[in-house]
Amino acid sequence: IPLLTAIDQEGGKVNRLQAISPEWKNLPSAKEMRIMADDSVYNLAKLIGNALHHYGINLNLAPVLDPPKDSKGKPSFIEVSNRSFGEFETAVPKIRAFVQGMKESKVLSTSKHFPGYDSWTNSDHQIAFSTSSKDVILKNVELFKEFADEIPVIMLSSVRFVRLSNTPAVFNPKITAMAREISPYTVLLTDDLWGVSLRAWISGTDKVKGKNYPSKDFKKLIRTVLLAGNDMFMITYPAKAVEMIAYLEWLGKKYPEYRLRLEQAAARIIRLKYLSGIWKEN
């Protein structure tokens, strides 16, 4: 069964292609795509998608479906970073054009960061928090619902939505259940688990230093995201990915509850690969 090979190619500041060739520099951000014609967004996404496909990428960790305003009504971190497609009415046609362009190039899309990154700080370094009410959070979720049939993967946020729980969304079974309600077949993907803020949260400390992360904490991190309801785990440290796979295999063999979760996750991922044409039976 072929692998899902992913990259986050949003455009603007999040532009991985520019590391390959200078021709990909200065690609429009989501904020800039807001004022582009829908067919122009489609053609741009198709062009980028063709490049991704050429390099063996079949999953783009984009587009961003996060709101432009934070929980206080001010520009959010995502908006300030030019990564938001804007409010619902503006965002829908642009996001749809982006996703269709990628699909035409045989590249799947990912909606992120569920249930909507509406904080004003960067959660990569320290867990960001949102004080949005449940009603506002549910309003932000509407954009994810809009694309339930078009975007097969949802990435969970690392933000703490304190009106719902004190736990970061990616660790929170209640919030993953909200994502699951959108579609039982949607594949739920974590944010980067090697991120400093998520590792520090698991360890119960303010900071973690370098790569010397305690094994017991790393195992706790894996168990937490699995039982929270996530299907795919993203980690930007290849050696730890190997360690993670080995530990998941051990958990599945030893404990029925972990085996069930692993089988559920694997079934969703295999279904996605089959329906998208990534895996074709002979």
What are these regions (language model features)?
Residues I1-K25, A45-K69, A91-G116:
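Glycine-rich, aromatic-flanked loop segments that form ligand/cofactor-binding clefts
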Residues D8, L52, I154, D191, ...:
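Divalent metal-coordination and catalytic microenvironments
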Residues N15-P28, S71-S76, F129-S132, V208:
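Aromatic- and acidic-residue-enriched segments that line the glycan-binding/catalytic groove
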Residues P22-M36, S81-S84:
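A charged helix-plus-loop insertion that forms the helical arch/lid used to bind
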Residues R34-N50, E89-V92, V136:
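Glycine-rich anion/phosphate-binding loops
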Residues N60-F85, S109-F129:
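Short glycine/serine-rich loop/turn segments
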Residues P93-E257:
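Second-shell residues forming the walls of enzyme active-site clefts
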Residues V242, K253-N282:
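Mid-to-C-terminal alpha-helical segments outside catalytic/metal-binding sites
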